[in-house]
UniProtKB/Swiss-Prot annotation:
GO terms of biological process kind: D-galacturonate catabolic process; D-glucuronate catabolic process
Family: Belongs to the short-chain dehydrogenases/reductases (SDR) family.
pH-activity profile: Optimum pH is 7.0 for the reduction of 11-DOC, and 9.5 for the oxidation of D-gluconate.
Active site location: 158
Name listed for the protein in its UniProt record: 2-dehydro-3-deoxy-D-gluconate 5-dehydrogenase
Broadest EC class assigned to this enzyme: oxidoreductase
Annotated binding of NAD(+), by residue: 14-38
Expression triggers: Is under the control of KdgR repressor. Its expression is up-regulated in the presence of galacturonate and glucuronate. Is also up-regulated in intestinal E.coli of mice fed a lactose-rich diet and down-regulated in E.coli of mice on a casein-rich diet.
CDD domains named in the record: Ga5DH-like_SDR_c
EC number: 1.1.1.127, 1.1.1.-
Length: 253
């Protein structure tokens, strides 16, 4: 039956940045589909751990600043040592800094680029090596953005990094498909998370945004559950190098 293709029973998913918001929603979706979760965060994701384990799934919490890539191989080695294998990687951890392009600092450029694109590549590289060694392939899902497609304003390093995420997703898909590794991305639209709290509090700006979204509402972390389970499951085995917009129709407007 087709529904069995969406089952993730027995799988292990590594999810970065899953303490709140979209990362938490995706981790919970994967756990509901059957995954045990390895969460990599800069803080202990207490709420996520509680919700995942309440589903009867295991959760391994690892603490790291992924802007520093030296420790990435050891993180995935630790995950494999704990569970025996890893099957899915979700590169969700991200950072945004806002300033006019004329005033944007090197530090704000480097901090965002190091986390949003550099860590994505080296996390994927380390995971792919495990997938190849295990011999069963794997799934890598990167988190892109509407600014992978659009320019935006006052977020130069974020736009550059998310454009890079979509590009490197395609490259890795091209190189690793022969190893049965699927690499795809999700581009969330305007989501009701901590990152958009200021925007949502601005009544005029929030109204302008909602007027542009055909669905007429802000997205929720739960809106990513279906797409992440699809891309992590065998139902997407012939989907490779693609970025799925989950934006209520924003990009279609």
């Amino acid at each position: 039956m087709i529904l069995s293709a969406f089952s993730l029973e027995g799988k292990v998913a590594v999810v970065t940045g899953c303490d709140t918001g979209l990362g938490q929603g995706m981790a919970l979706g994967l756990a509901q589909a059957g995954c045990d979760i390895v969460g990599i965060n800069i803080v202990e994701p207490t709420e996520t751990i509680e919700q995942v384990t309440a589903l009867g799934r295991r959760f391994l919490s690892l603490t790291a600043d992924l802007r520093k890539i030296d420790g990435i191989p050891a993180l995935l080695d630790r995950a494999v040592a704990e569970f025996g294998h890893i099957d899915i990687l979700v590169n969700n951890a991200g950072l945004i800094r806002r300033e006019d392009a004329l005033e944007f600092s090197e530090k704000d450029w480097d901090d965002v680029m190091n986390l949003n694109i550099k860590s994505v590549f080296f996390m994927s590289q380390a995971a792919a090596k495990h997938f190849i060694a295990q011999g069963n392939g794997g799934k890598i899902i990167n988190i892109a953005s509407m600014l992978s497609f659009q320019g935006g304003i006052r977020v130069p390093s974020y736009t550059a990094s998310k454009s890079g995420v979509m590009g490197v997703t395609r490259l890795m898909a091209n190189e690793w498909a022969k190893h049965n590794i699927n690499v795809n991305a999700i581009a969330p639209g305007y989501m009701a998370t901590n990152n958009t709290q200021q925007l949502r509090a601005d009544e005029q700006r929030s109204a302008e945004i909602l007027d542009r979204i055909p669905a007429g509402r802000w997205g929720l972390p739960s809106d990513l559950m279906g797409p992440i389970v699809f891309l992590a499951s065998s139902a997407s085995d012939y989907v490779n190098g693609y970025t799925i917009a989950v934006d209520g129709g924003w990009l279609a407007r």
